[in-house]
Amino acid sequence: MITILHYLRECSDMTADLIYTFQSLGLANGYDDVEAEFAPFKEFKSTWKRSGHSVRFQISDYLRGADRRVLEDFANSLYGCLTGEGPRGIYSDSLITWMGSKDFVNRNQPIYLKRSRNLTLDHHGQVYDLQDAYLSLREQGLVRACPDAVFNWTVRENRRRVGYCSVLMKVVAVSSILDSVDVPSYVSEYVLYHELLHIEDGMRPNRRHHDKNFRNRERLHPRWRESEEWLRRLASRPV
């Protein structure tokens, strides 16, 4: 009971900090009627509706736990977007640092997984184990240790989007279409490798994700050419 009350009090304090931060900075930016609330979006995003000197913000609840400085930097970035006078993008150095912290992942990864409907929440597949693929990549020296990352097969057999990840949440998804005796194990390993490269790169606001350097690293996988051919065949397979 005490733990629940403490959690509710903490949430209330965080919401109060959010409102105070956005309202005080709103006045400095010409908005005298400001509302701000946390919203349970699956991905990290925020929305706003503006009318004259009024503005309503819905802020990703993954920002719960951020300190006042991070909230202020984020609010300033959003107001900059509204006025068109701020820096490009919403990711300040303090925000990037905090979202790359272990505390951020520990707080938010379980929430993100709960909101992800197309994940089995298991690295064990019917045929292959993504944890084994990760260990194989480590033994080959292709990836660094990533102890916070979680690997999941998808529920649906995606043919074109065979892998994706949340760099923020350290979550990797590999399409279950690759979890088959008809598909060699190195194909899912290659897809996992691709996504782990993104996680290793971390947040890269306003930069290309698949640049020349990334493609060169991707091709360090010894079976990249065969894997790409497999992925092309699977993508063109009739539904």
Please report, for each region that a protein language model flagged, where it lies by residue.
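Active-site-proximal or metal-binding-adjacent scaffold patches in catalytic folds
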Residues: 1-189, 199-239
